[in-house]
């Protein structure tokens, strides 16, 4: 009976021995370890893990076969049962030892796969997030607008001085023309550029000497006299200009600038004086008066008036001379014929 009870206990231990390595802590760690790692990545395909049952099955068969004869040969005892249980558990330990190095390998293999899949997932996420990035590309479009807008502003700003620059030149040219009209030599190009621009309606500069050698004050007096004479004359709005504004080429000789070598208008004052000796006293006196007026207008610079007055004086003096000669001849004929 003792042998039968020991055999039954050994058989129970042998039957429980495969359950222990399958249900031991090593098996729980092996089963729980990899699923925890794989739970983080749902997309990873679960690789077939060599469970402890598969590895332990051939290992356990050896000890079972070896234990059976040992248990049958040995008598029933506590020491033998303990040894049997230890031997039965030892394959589980071996299985644990065999499984424990494999678990880290499985974990290490799974970790690179997880990292690769994580990087792939991150790349896919970045690619999915990357398409919105081209949205800021329209930003370069506003660039031509600021470029197009400032181009007119700098163009306008430099043009302002360019537009203002011709004004001194125009003023200098107008002053030069006035000086030429007033018988004044125009300013030289160097003087006009270096000196300040003269203000309009300003007296001629002192640097420009007049052509006739008269000072600027004399020219101003001549201009004022011309204005006064026009105010008192019967033709205030006459288009005929004076010497101060329109220099006549007739006054200019071969030695004067702008002169064509023409003669000055004659006043015929000598012919008028000769006509005064003729018996045409009202006519010759008027001719002499016109000759004097022609000379005065020529001195004042009114060339057109001098020519007009000179022509009248010439006509009257000729009439006086011819009429006087005819009167003298008629008187002589009458007197000589009567006394015969």
UniProtKB/Swiss-Prot annotation:
Side Extracellular, residues: 339-340
GO molecular function, one term: syntaxin-1 binding
Coiled coil: none
Residue numbers bearing the Phosphoserine modification: 28, 238, 248-249
Chain positions covered by the region annotation Disordered: 1-261
Documented effect of changing residue 308 to C: In EKD1; no effect on location at the plasma membrane
Annotated GO CC locations: axon terminus; dendritic spine; glutamatergic synapse; membrane; plasma membrane; postsynaptic density membrane; presynapse; presynaptic membrane
Listed transmembrane segments: 318-338
Cellular localization per UniProt: Cell membrane; Presynaptic cell membrane; Synapse; Cell projection, Axon
InterPro entries hit by this protein: CD225/Dispanin, CD225/Dispanin_fam
Intramembrane segments: 269-289
In-chain residues carrying the UniProt-annotated modification Omega-N-methylarginine: 240
Bias type Basic and acidic residues, positions: 9-18
Residues bearing PTM Phosphothreonine: 74
Illness the protein is tied to: Episodic kinesigenic dyskinesia 1: An autosomal dominant form of paroxysmal kinesigenic dyskinesia, a neurologic condition characterized by recurrent and brief attacks of abnormal involuntary movements, triggered by sudden voluntary movement. These attacks usually have onset during childhood or early adulthood and can involve dystonic postures, chorea, or athetosis. Convulsions, familial infantile, with paroxysmal choreoathetosis: A syndrome characterized by clinical features of benign familial infantile seizures and episodic kinesigenic dyskinesia. Benign familial infantile seizures is a disorder characterized by afebrile seizures occurring during the first year of life, without neurologic sequelae. Paroxysmal choreoathetosis is a disorder of involuntary movements characterized by attacks that occur spontaneously or are induced by a variety of stimuli.
Subunit structure of this chain's protein: Component of the outer core of AMPAR complex. AMPAR complex consists of an inner core made of 4 pore-forming GluA/GRIA proteins (GRIA1, GRIA2, GRIA3 and GRIA4) and 4 major auxiliary subunits arranged in a twofold symmetry. One of the two pairs of distinct binding sites is occupied either by CNIH2, CNIH3 or CACNG2, CACNG3. The other harbors CACNG2, CACNG3, CACNG4, CACNG8 or GSG1L. This inner core of AMPAR complex is complemented by outer core constituents binding directly to the GluA/GRIA proteins at sites distinct from the interaction sites of the inner core constituents.
Function: As a component of the outer core of AMPAR complex, may be involved in synaptic transmission in the central nervous system. In hippocampal neurons, in presynaptic terminals, plays an important role in the final steps of neurotransmitter release, possibly by regulating Ca(2+)-sensing. In the cerebellum, may inhibit SNARE complex formation and down-regulate short-term facilitation.
Family: Belongs to the CD225/Dispanin family.
Protein name per its UniProtKB record: Proline-rich transmembrane protein 2
Classification of source organism: Eukaryota, Metazoa, Chordata, Craniata, Vertebrata
Gene this protein is translated from: PRRT2
């Amino acid at each position: 009976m003792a042998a039968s009870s020991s055999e039954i206990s050994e058989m129970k231990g042998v039957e429980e021995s495969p359950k222990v390595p399958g249900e031991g802590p090593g098996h729980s760690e092996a089963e729980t370890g990899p699923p925890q790692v794989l739970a983080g990545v749902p997309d990873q395909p679960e690789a077939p893990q060599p469970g402890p049952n598969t590895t332990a099955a051939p290992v356990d068969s050896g000890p079972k076969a070896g234990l059976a004869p040992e248990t049958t040969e040995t008598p029933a005892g506590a020491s033998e049962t303990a040894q049997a249980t230890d031997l039965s558990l030892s394959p589980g330990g071996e299985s644990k030892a065999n499984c424990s190095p494999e678990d880290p390998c499985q974990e290490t293999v799974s970790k690179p796969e997880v990292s690769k899949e994580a990087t792939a997932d991150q790349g896919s996420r970045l690619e999915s997030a990357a398409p919105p990035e081209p949205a800021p590309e329209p930003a370069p479009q506003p660039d031509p607008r600021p470029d197009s807008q400032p181009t007119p502003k700098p163009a306008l700003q430099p043009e302002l001085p360019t537009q203002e620059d011709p004004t001194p030149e125009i003023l200098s040219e107008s002053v030069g023309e006035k000086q030429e009209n007033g018988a004044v030599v125009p300013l030289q190009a160097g003087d006009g550029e270096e000196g300040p621009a003269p203000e309009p309606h300003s007296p001629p500069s002192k640097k420009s000497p007049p052509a006739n050698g008269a000072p600027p004050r004399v020219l101003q007096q001549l201009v004022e006299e011309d204005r006064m004479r026009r105010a008192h004359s019967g033709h205030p709005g006459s288009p005929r200009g004076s010497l101060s504004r329109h220099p006549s080429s007739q006054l200019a000789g071969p030695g004067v600038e702008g002169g064509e070598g023409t003669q000055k208008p004659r006043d015929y004052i000598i012919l008028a004086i000769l006509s005064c000796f003729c018996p045409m006293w009202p006519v010759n006196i008027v001719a002499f008066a016109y000759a004097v007026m022609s000379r005065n207008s020529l001195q004042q610079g009114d060339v057109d008036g001098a020519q007009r007055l000179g022509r009248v004086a010439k006509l009257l003096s000729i009439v006086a001379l011819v009429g006087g000669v005819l009167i003298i001849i008629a008187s002589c004929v009458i007197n000589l014929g009567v006394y015969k």
